[in-house]
Curated annotation (Swiss-Prot):
Function field: Part of the Sec protein translocase complex. Interacts with the SecYEG preprotein conducting channel. SecDF uses the proton motive force (PMF) to complete protein translocation after the ATP-dependent function of SecA.
Transmembrane segments: 14-34, 142-162, 166-186, 193-213, 245-265, 270-290
A Pfam family this chain is assigned to: SecD_SecF_C
GO cellular component, one term: plasma membrane
Swiss-Prot/TrEMBL keywords: Cell inner membrane, Cell membrane, Membrane, Protein transport, Translocation, Transmembrane, Transmembrane helix, Transport
Family from the record: Belongs to the SecD/SecF family. SecF subfamily.
Gene giving rise to this polypeptide: secF
Protein name per its UniProtKB record: Protein translocase subunit SecF
Membrane topology qualifier: Multi-pass membrane protein
């Protein structure tokens, strides 16, 4: 007979520890770092797409040229149909952006590249994004995450009950706040990759939670002689091996990406690994105890 662990009794302690870590992380972020490290995707910037008539130039070569000149710089390779050319998107972050600054940056970049590679340089596209537009992108990203929460609430309410939906949402809120605190404490640059990581974590954590909730729902119908507390603990025990195995295999796969990559992909994999750990324990120790408290109160 499978051993049944009383997971619910640990719920309050786990929630308190998580809440303290999140609170300390947020305080540290705003009072020590002065806020978050917003990446170029969400900052005022100059963007220049260009082509160099020379093959096999690497991103790091471009970064080494301009890192002493520009404090915040991002370089990405663009696929070129011409194998004799190398194409790049170069973004320079600045607090003050206008047409004159864009012209100055473009001239500096072209001059330096011609001097370094002794090749023809063609500007494919160039533009600047001011602070008002970058602020709009931040707000839209926040609304994107909130919209995801609303869709999750509707989906789980239709599939299960409102109590299940609220427990899932609160559990995911915990996961996101934990990740947000983690990003702030370690000064990880928040860019489009990190937003994708957060949305992926939401989906992963939700999947873990739904697996447990689905078993709880089935056992409520089947184990009619048991209290809901017993049903909850039995259900978590029955799905625990699957939950842990899925988390471990996912973590190992993402860890390999973290080891063998650099830049934004490395940050993405780091955040996702933290999300896997947090999402796993929150689905067991936070979502289920919350459901226990809500089950009799909300149908």
């Amino acid at each position: 007979m499978q051993r049944v662990i009383n997971f619910s009794k640990y719920g309050s302690n786990v929630l308190i520890v998580s809440a303290v870590l999140i609170l300390v992380g947020l305080i540290y972020t705003f009072f020590y770092h002065g806020g978050y490290n917003w990446g170029i995707d969400f900052s005022s910037r100059v963007n220049i797409n260009l082509s160099i008539e020379k093959s096999n130039i690497k991103e790091n070569e471009i970064k080494k040229i301009f890192s002493p000149i520009y404090k915040t710089l991002d370089v990405n390779s663009i696929f070129s149909p011409d194998q004799n050319k190398s194409e790049f998107s170069i973004m320079v972050k600045s607090d003050v952006i206008d047409y004159a600054f864009k012209t100055e940056v473009q001239k500096t970049i072209l001059d330096k590249l011609k001097e370094t590679f002794d090749a023809n340089i063609e500007v494919l596209d160039s533009y600047f994004i001011d602070s008002s537009f970058s602020s709009t992108l931040r707000i839209r990203s926040i609304f994107l995450v909130l919209g995801t929460f609303i869709l999750i609430l509707i989906y789980i309410t239709l599939r299960f009950k409102l109590s299940y939906a609220i427990a899932s949402i609160l559990s995911i809120f915990h996961d996101i706040f934990f990740i947000v605190a983690f990003l702030g404490v370690f000064r990880i640059e928040i860019n489009s990759y990190i937003i994708v990581a957060i949305l992926t974590i939401i989906g992963y954590s939700l999947n873990d939670t739904i697996i447990i909730f689905d078993r709880i729902r089935d056992n409520v119908k089947r184990l009619t002689d048991n209290t809901f507390l017993n049903v909850l603990n039995i259900s978590i025990s029955q799905t625990l091996s699957r939950t842990v195995l899925t988390s471990v295999t996912t973590f190992v796969a993402v860890f390999s990406i973290y080891v063998f990559t650099e830049g934004s992909i490395k940050d993405f994999s780091l955040v996702f690994m933290v999300g896997v750990i947090v999402g796993t324990y929150s689905s067991v120790f936070i979502a289920s105890p919350i459901l226990l408290n809500l089950y009799k109160k909300i149908k």
